[in-house]
Amino acid sequence: GVTGLANAAEMCGHPYASKGFNEFTEKVMTELRDHCYSASCDLAREKGSFPLYDEYQYLQSKFVKTLSPWVQDKIKECGIRNSHLTSIAPTGTISLTADNVSSGIEPPYSLYYDRTIQQFDGHTVQRVEDYAYTQGVSSRTANEISAKEHLEVLALVSKYVDSAVSKTCNVGNNVNYQEFKELYTQAWELGCKGITTFRAAGKRYGILNEVVEGDTPKAEACFIDPATGQKECD
């Protein structure tokens, strides 16, 4: 899987869910998928394929047919060690160990927010800043992205993953039941492997909560033009 995807793309000048972002994501996911399968072929050459492997049935599967031709040829030659290889995990906590890069395929929840940490003696609240913002790059945050755009990114990544994808689709506080229902129907129609929605005005106090008051992080926010590399700073 991946983490930090949104930060990486936006530091190359591609705002989340834009055409450039989607093209960047497809390149990343193609490389990830193909080389995961290639590595599993190398293991199969050494240790054998997984017990239920049937070459004909496996190579006829819809997902395997999307692999690059050189990977399919390698499977024919070597077999494959693992039945499943790719997923997009919920990496919110893991990403904190890398200075709070954007988690998984998610956009930053906010440029800075309060994170609730449960402990034996209660809980504490920590102020957390988005990594890209501290490096001077202005990112689109989760609540600035429409539910439709969230869903498009989810559907795009799902094509390259053979198991599950963790992706939250943020919906507005005024979303009605029919709109909410249609989001799940569209996810199914697009072939998504699951969908999670989040409405900030829910009854439960969230683990992550956007800060609406207080000082702005001390970083100059810039947009990077991917064609020229020039920065336009606020």
Protein language model regions, located:
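Core structural elements
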Residues: 1-12
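Catalytic alpha/beta core of large soluble enzyme barrels
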Residues: 61-62, 74-81, 86-217, 222, ...
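Poly-acidic low-complexity segments
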Residues: 4, 15, 67, 129-132
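Generic structural signal for well-ordered, non-membrane alpha-helical segments
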Residues: 1-2, 22-37, 64, 68, ...
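Internal maturation/activation junctions in enzymes
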Residues: 14-91, 183
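Alpha-helix capping/termination and helix-coil
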Residues: 9, 40, 44-47, 161-165
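Acidic, glycine-enriched catalytic cores built around paired aspartates
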Residues: 227
